[in-house]
Amino acid sequence: MDQLNNREQQEFQQLVEQKQMKDFMRLYSSLVQRCFTDCVNDFTSKALSSREESCLEKCSEKFLKHSERVGQRFQEQNAALMQKR
């Protein structure tokens, strides 16, 4: 990265930020789709039932913890790979 000029560094940073936003939106979309499908069953009311709300809270918490754990493992493996070089 030190070999890039200022403009190239800015372009690179912008690409990284765009990728991060895209990844975040993909994660959020997956979370919404999965938890909605698993938890929301009653369409006779505008409001969620207490059971559905509880399910959604647990589902989203579990999904985010899983995603965080996968990210940590990826970082650990990446660090181990970099040490081998």
UniProtKB/Swiss-Prot annotation:
Mitochondrial intermembrane chaperone that participates in the import and insertion of multi-pass transmembrane proteins into the mitochondrial inner membrane. Also required for the transfer of beta-barrel precursors from the TOM complex to the sorting and assembly machinery (SAM complex) of the outer membrane. Acts as a chaperone-like protein that protects the hydrophobic precursors from aggregation and guide them through the mitochondrial intermembrane space. Keywords: Chaperone, Disulfide bond, Membrane, Metal-binding, Mitochondrion, Mitochondrion inner membrane, Protein transport, Translocation, Transport, Zinc. Belongs to the small Tim family. The keyword Nucleus does not apply. GO terms for cellular component: mitochondrial intermembrane space protein transporter complex; TIM22 mitochondrial import inner membrane insertion complex. The lineage of its organism: Eukaryota, Fungi, Dikarya, Ascomycota, Saccharomycotina. This is Mitochondrial import inner membrane translocase subunit TIM9. InterPro entries: Mito_inner_translocase_sub (IPR050673), Tim10-like (IPR004217), Tim10-like_dom_sf (IPR035427). GO terms for molecular function: metal ion binding; protein transporter activity; unfolded protein binding. The keyword Coiled coil does not apply. It is a peripheral membrane protein. Its main location: mitochondrion. The gene is TIM9. The twin CX3C motif contains 4 conserved Cys residues that form 2 disulfide bonds in the mitochondrial intermembrane space. However, during the transit of TIM9 from cytoplasm into mitochondrion, the Cys residues probably coordinate zinc, thereby preventing folding and allowing its transfer across mitochondrial outer membrane. A motif (Twin CX3C motif) lies at residues 35-59. Disulfide bonds join C35-C59, C39-C55. Pfam families: zf-Tim10_DDP. It is found in: Mitochondrion inner membrane. One of its GO terms (biological process) is protein insertion into mitochondrial inner membrane. Heterohexamer; composed of 3 copies of TIM9 and 3 copies of TIM10, named soluble 70 kDa complex. Associates with the TIM22 complex, whose core is composed of TIM22 and TIM54. Interacts with the transmembrane regions of multi-pass transmembrane proteins in transit.
